[in-house]
Regions:
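Rossmann-fold dinucleotide-binding core
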Residues: 4-83, 87
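Helical "substrate-binding/catalytic lid" subdomain
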Residues: 74-197
């Protein structure tokens, strides 16, 4: 199962599969539309080691980084960790570019300068230029990101941990979706900042 879903559901699917003498793997991916087209996805796999080994030739056709994370559900927990990092990172990217614009800096020059330093990230490198062009075409839809953030918050609640950064990111994305931006890419978050003026 290469969708992004609940880690608990992944465990339930594996139990049902094993009753029938089958294996089930949860193998969500990261890398967006570009990673998928170029077979450079990061694939995070949960499930039995033997099943992962059997599926490895298929995974290698789609991805560059294939990581067996442990038992069923661990692929999904890893994907949630990925989404949590992206949520806060995307807020940081948007706030940095918005701050630069409002201060009168040449935002393209700022993007080049900070991409080469400690602030550099895949979000900044891939989505920063799209933000500057006001290109909100989806590599990953806001509506799907909202779903993922809710799954992460549900699992965090089960673990009895608080993720205030993720809660804030979800709030901003939900506000954007309510204004009709749910079918845009996650870089569309910058519009939340534009609308504050």
């Amino acid at each position: 199962d290469m969708t992004t879903s609940s880690p608990i559901l992944a465990g339930e699917i594996e139990k049902e599969a094993m009753i029938k003498g089958l294996y089930a793997l949860d193998a969500p991916v990261s890398g967006g539309d570009i990673g998928a087209r170029e077979a450079r996805l990061s694939i995070m796999v949960g499930g039995e080691k033997e099943a992962v080994a059997q599926a490895m030739p298929i995974f290698k056709v789609m991805g560059k980084q294939i990581s067996h994370m442990g038992k069923a559900g661990m692929g999904q927990y890893t994907k949630m960790s990925n989404q949590i990092a992206i949520a806060s990172n995307m807020m940081g990217v948007c706030e940095a570019l918005w701050y630069a614009e409002r201060s009168g800096l040449d935002v393209k020059s700022v993007l080049e300068a900070i991409s080469a330093g400690a602030a550099g990230s895949a979000s900044l490198a891939n989505l920063g230029p799209r933000i500057l062009r006001k290109d909100y075409a989806p590599g990953f839809y806001i509506k799907h990101f909202i779903k993922d953030m809710k799954i992460a918050l549900d699992s965090a609640e089960e673990m009895k941990i608080d993720l205030p950064g993720l809660k804030l990111s979800l709030k901003l994305y939900e506000e954007l979706a309510e204004k009709g931006h749910e079918n845009e890419g996650t870089q569309g978050l910058i519009q939340w900042y534009y609308e504050q003026v």
